[in-house]
């Protein structure tokens, strides 16, 4: 049965004009209206990679990924890409170089399974991380002749008819807090992908960007392990919160926390099953698959 989450946004505050965004929670893609097959849409797929980030964006015949999950889950990523018939990725956007965000990209670039047009990172090619994943990624781009592009705060990208805006905190507070966050906008629909920013950076975002953070969909920062401050909730005002983690492992973002701090918001844990979010720029349809079982 289709469940409707009523979402009435004052779009004057967003600068988007008078519009109403509605979010529908459905059992599966079969519940999406048939005429949507002919529409120009944006699809956000949050792959079940346990407690790691791996997201696929598709719009206008183009596809990209934001983070890749741990390398051991790469076959789940490939199965998702292959299921969509994706053979080319316009961008591999790495928010920061922790293994649970970057390791899978290293495998993907060496796999030769997909054409990769560019690897995007907030770090320079000479940046050194202690675990060495960034250096491995830089080496892979050179070996496979993949353009390496450093991205920074305020940069804009396009994917089909979607616009992506990069947000990044300049404070020297560690690579998690300096993750390259990404606001994805398609028509009046907005999804904010936050990397691993923590409480301190969320407060800085709220004070610095204010209403620019408004979104319908929010990726819970740092796998639900970070306390989300009220100021960040006030500026983002999401109707859907998804956590790239298993519900049993998310210590800060829980059903009880959402009930108290984001009443009415829907909560998904993509570590409990891949979550897919589809929009035509006005409405969202969201569904979740069962927990992924790796083939034997």
Residue ranges and their predicted role:
Residues 1-5:
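Positively charged n-region of N-terminal signal peptides that target proteins for export
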Residues 51-53, 71-73, 97-103, 126-129, ...:
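Active-site environment of divalent metal-dependent phosphoester hydrolases
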Residues 20-88, 150-214, 275-296:
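Core dinuclear metal-dependent hydrolase active-site scaffold
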Residues 147-152, 267-271:
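Short acidic-hydrophobic, aromatic-tinged amphipathic segments that line or gate anion-handling sites
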Residues 6-15, 263:
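Hydrophobic helical h-region of N-terminal Sec-dependent signal peptides
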Residues 182, 241-296:
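Binuclear metal-dependent phosphoesterase catalytic core
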Residues 102-114, 128-138, 230-234, 252-256:
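Metal-dependent catalytic neighborhoods of phosphoester/phosphodiester hydrolases
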Residues 60-64, 72-121, 208-225, 237-241:
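Active-site metal-binding motif and surrounding structural segment of the metallo-beta-lactamase
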């Amino acid at each position: 049965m289709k469940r409707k989450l009523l979402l009435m946004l004052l779009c004057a505050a967003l600068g988007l004009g008078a519009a109403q965004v509605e979010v529908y929670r459905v059992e599966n893609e079969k519940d999406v209206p048939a005429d949507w097959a002919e529409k120009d849409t944006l699809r956000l797929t949050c792959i079940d990679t346990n407690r790691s980030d791996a997201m696929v964006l598709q719009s206008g015949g183009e596809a990209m990924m934001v983070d890749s999950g741990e390398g051991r889950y790469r076959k789940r990523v490939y199965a998702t890409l292959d299921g969509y018939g994706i053979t080319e990725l316009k961008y591999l956007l790495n928010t920061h170089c922790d293994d649970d965000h970057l390791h899978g990209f290293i495998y993907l670039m060496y796999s030769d399974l997909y054409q990769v047009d560019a690897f995007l990172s907030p770090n320079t090619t000479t940046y050194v991380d202690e675990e060495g994943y960034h250096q491995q990624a830089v080496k892979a781009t050179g070996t496979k002749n993949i353009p390496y592009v450093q991205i920074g705060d305020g940069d804009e990208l396009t994917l089909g008819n979607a616009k992506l805006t990069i947000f990044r905190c300049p404070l020297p507070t560690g690579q998690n807090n300096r993750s390259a966050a990404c606001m994805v906008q398609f028509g009046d629909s907005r999804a904010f992908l936050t990397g691993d920013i923590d409480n301190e950076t969320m407060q800085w975002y709220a004070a610095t960007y204010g209403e620019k953070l408004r979104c319908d969909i929010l990726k819970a920062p740092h796998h639900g392990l970070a306390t989300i401050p009220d100021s960040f909730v006030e500026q983002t005002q999401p109707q859907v919160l998804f956590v790239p983690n298993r519900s049993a492992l998310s210590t800060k973002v829980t059903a009880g926390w959402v009930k108290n701090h984001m009443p009415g918001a829907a909560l998904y844990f993509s570590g409990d099953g891949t979550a897919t979010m589809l929009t035509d720029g006005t409405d969202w349809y969201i569904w979740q698959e069962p927990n992924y079982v790796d083939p034997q």
